[in-house]
Amino acid sequence: FNSEIVIEPQVADLTPENAENLLAGAEIILDGTDNFETRYLINDFAVKNSVSWIYAAAVGSYGVTLNVIPGETACMACIFPDSPTGFVETCETSGILNSAVNLIAAVAATEAVKMLVGAEQKLRRTLLSWDVWQNERAELDASRPRSECRACGKRDLIHLAGEGRPHITLCGRNSVQIHERHRPRGRAEDP
């Protein structure tokens, strides 16, 4: 599409300890994560550093997407002040219809292109929810930040400070999250 765009893929868990390093220099962040805690971490980073990002999620037959433009639109914490508690649908518990993923990914990718080419007047300023099975589409106004918002209003970036919920739920049966093994200084690699 554009030879001037530089994409730097990273294989790493996004944590409060490495978020600044992994996301530094980004012009836009596209969410492809499977849990709210990581999304709140992205949101806190984006608010702190004035980086636009696009929240996108799908489960079952529906998906949602939200453009977050710090200082201009509502952020994720404006719309969802707290992580859901109790039972939360996941890909493992509810499955996922690939057409829901395709639709939300297409909308999010198109919004990213609009951001990158400077077509601000064409950007959607709503939380879009779309259920492809029920043929139901809904939008929630997200055109303005909330002054009482923890993140963008009060600048209380608890997830970036490592004060959010510690656990992460992954999609899929028997999913695991492998963390780098730390060795004492001076110890040689195991054969």
Where are these regions (language model features)?
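Adenine nucleotide-associated cytosolic modules
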Residues: 1-191
